[in-house]
């Protein structure tokens, strides 16, 4: 019986070219999952796995949500176990649930949480280097928090989007940016209705520039008015970014 299934997925994105299919490579999260599902249902047609977003190359996820229509009588636990048996060790299916016919992991999402992690100190973090952005000096947390308040709200985030050909609206709502420091780790946690291409990484780069005194807090409002990518901060490396949670009604 054809049924819509919802998947919660955890993955280490280090060796992948992002979530979405890419030409000339099979190293995408979507591709690996679809290959296993095709084998599971013994179908000539590859089942389409719809992700809640398009994570970039090198970005990680603790709870990516996806859905797919499958013609199978297997239980949700059996599907999960089968997938985990044949998926690479850097991709894990945490949960499989039956979903409503109209459920769409991307269009039904109402919020997302991302965490960006920096590691500070004089010595390189050899064993966690794939999951952090290493910076030797510690930025000014107080100044970054001041800037973060100005970056929150409903704004046109065109200056924080790396896609200059974006045709759809670049207005988004970011309702929370939390910056925490614990030991040598600095974490930027973002929650919003949705994020543009590279938006979280550009927001992080902008905040770090404030923290290092390369940008004034007072300059933040001008970035929304300018709608010019070249005026915002640098794009922080993909390694530090992780999708933490996706919200649905």
PLM regions with names:
Residues 1-249:
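Structured-RNA-binding interfaces characteristic of tRNA pseudouridine synthases
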């Amino acid at each position: 019986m054809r049924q819509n299934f919802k998947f919660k997925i955890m993955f280490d994105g280090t060796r992948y070219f992002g979530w979405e299919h890419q030409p000339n490579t099979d190293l995408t999260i979507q591709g690996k999952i679809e290959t296993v599902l095709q084998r599971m249902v013994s179908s000539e047609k590859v089942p389409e796995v719809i992700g809640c977003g398009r994570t970039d190359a090198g970005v990680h996820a603790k709870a990516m949500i996806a859905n797919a229509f499958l013609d199978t009588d297997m239980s949700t636990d059996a599907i999960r176990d089968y997938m985990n048996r044949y998926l690479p060790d850097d991709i894990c299916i945490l949960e499989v649930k039956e979903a409503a016919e109209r459920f769409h992991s991307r269009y039904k999402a109402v919020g997302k949480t991302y965490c960006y992690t920096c590691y500070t100190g004089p010595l390189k973090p050899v064993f966690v280097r794939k999951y952090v952005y290493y910076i030797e000096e510690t930025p000014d947390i107080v100044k970054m928090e001041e800037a973060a308040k100005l970056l929150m709200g409903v704004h046109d985030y065109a200056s924080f989007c790396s896609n200059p050909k974006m045709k759809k609206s670049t207005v988004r709502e970011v309702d929370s940016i939390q910056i925490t420091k614990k030991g040598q780790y600095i974490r930027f946690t973002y929650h919003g209705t949705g994020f543009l291409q590279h938006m979280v990484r550009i927001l992080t780069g902008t905040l770090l520039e404030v923290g290092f005194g390369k940008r004034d807090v007072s300059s933040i409002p001008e970035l929304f008015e300018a709608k010019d990518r070249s005026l915002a901060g640098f794009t922080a490396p993909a390694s530090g970014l992780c999708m933490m949670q996706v919200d649905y009604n």
